[in-house]
Amino acid sequence: MIFDKGNVEDFDKELWDAIHAEEERQEHHIELIASENMVSKAVMAAQGSVLTNKYAEGYPGNRYYGGTECVDIVETLAIERAKKLFGAAFANVQAHSGSQANAAAYMALIEAGDTVLGMDLAAGGHLTHGSPVNFSGKTYHFVGYSVDADTEMLNYEAILEQAKAVQPKLIVAGASAYSRNIDFEKFRAIADHVGAYLMVDMAHIAGLVAAGVHPSPVPYAHIVTSTTHKTLRGPRGGLILTNDEALAKKINSAVFPGLQGGPLEHVIAAKAVAFKEALDPAFKDYAQAIIDNTAAMAAVFAQDDRFRLISGGTDNHVFLVDVTKVIANGKLAQNLLDEVNITLNKNAIPFETLSPFNTSGIRIGCAAITSRGMGVKESQTIARLIIKALVNHDQETILEEVRQEVRQLTDAFPLYKK
């Protein structure tokens, strides 16, 4: 019987080897990809539970299948915890991803072809904020706003003037590579001025918002979307919040049956665990440590004139660095750092001159190293190791030194092998 095959290692050695190799990679590499984090064993246990067997189209108390009394409890726990965590009146926890959450929000707020003002991808926005290769840019008429050419920060007066000119039905705030706090109150004022809805995509900063160390968009946005991983440190999935009951009904209809069929109740259970973890007072200390570590790491780059820190600093979990004075492009930097077991990603910088396949910059985030227990001292050390590797990118002896120092750090802060 299939139920006898409960051990992946014995049943599927080929797959197990790949999983084990990934576990070893995470254990012994320094993870600086800003959209990644390390979940608890409790989150993983919930996601790997028997809930994966249950189909449950619909919502708690209103399902299209029988036998849903247990998953109703699970999903209701996730909903109520999300509402409490973010101070929202309504929450939908069924979206499979942040992109699905954004798609549902658009469906709830606007029609195909409507004009939307969103952050340009090159300035730090996201694919789902109007990229022409994404469903958002193909379905709606997106106009991109950028950052100020001198400060590399959002210029709210300029965004207001742009909104007046294009008269959008919706304004999208939020980013995937913007290192500064976003003034959601100003965005709402801009939206109100032109009669537009405001949607905030807080996927990257959700954990910081939950902990109260970053301004919350919930009091200002008509709809807030998010992922449940990244700084929130939950499973990979989506979340939608609103304080408007009429919009909540539209959101629910957009998610199901509009975009999705049955929800992933095992993932929703893992979301519930993550929300409970984030409601613990210790999570605020964790979120503040992310900000402290990121600022400390960024400061090392700011003090080295061979690198340029985009916008001059960071207020959150992420920052961008122009590396072109020491190496040809961000892609080469990413690949080189992979070789010394430091994982991050190439990233376009504002007013980028290179191809998006190469880029001038790299993006660095500190959520994952903070989850391992690393602090300011280790963050500064990691920054120096990155600089050491990039500056000496053709010196194998020095690169080997960096590898050894990385291994010492990861051994000192084990992930799951405690």
From Swiss-Prot:
* Residues marked Plays an important role in substrate specificity (site): H229
Establish whether keyword Amino-acid biosynthesis is in the entry: yes
Main localization (coarse): cytoplasm
Q: Where in the cell is it found?
A: Cytoplasm
| Entry GO terms, CC | cytosol
- UniProt xrefs under Gene3D superfamilies: Aspartate Aminotransferase, domain 1 (3.90.1150.10), Type I PLP-dependent aspartate aminotransferase-like (Major domain) (3.40.640.10)
**Biological processes, Gene Ontology terms:** glycine biosynthetic process from serine; tetrahydrofolate interconversion
Keyword tags = Amino-acid biosynthesis, Cytoplasm, One-carbon metabolism, Pyridoxal phosphate, Transferase
Identify the enzyme class: transferase
EC number annotated for this UniProt entry: 2.1.2.1
Q: Which cofactor does it need?
A: pyridoxal 5'-phosphate
**Residues with N6-(pyridoxal phosphate)lysine modification:** K230
Task: List the HAMAP family hit by this protein, alphabetically.
Answer: SHMT
Family, per entry: Belongs to the SHMT family.
- Return the PANTHER family for the record: SERINE HYDROXYMETHYLTRANSFERASE, SERINE HYDROXYMETHYLTRANSFERASE 1
Explain the purpose of this protein: Catalyzes the reversible interconversion of serine and glycine with tetrahydrofolate (THF) serving as the one-carbon carrier. This reaction serves as the major source of one-carbon groups required for the biosynthesis of purines, thymidylate, methionine, and other important biomolecules. Also exhibits THF-independent aldolase activity toward beta-hydroxyamino acids, producing glycine and aldehydes, via a retro-aldol mechanism.
Q: What is this protein called?
A: Serine hydroxymethyltransferase
Please name the source species: Streptococcus pyogenes serotype M3 (strain ATCC BAA-595 / MGAS315)
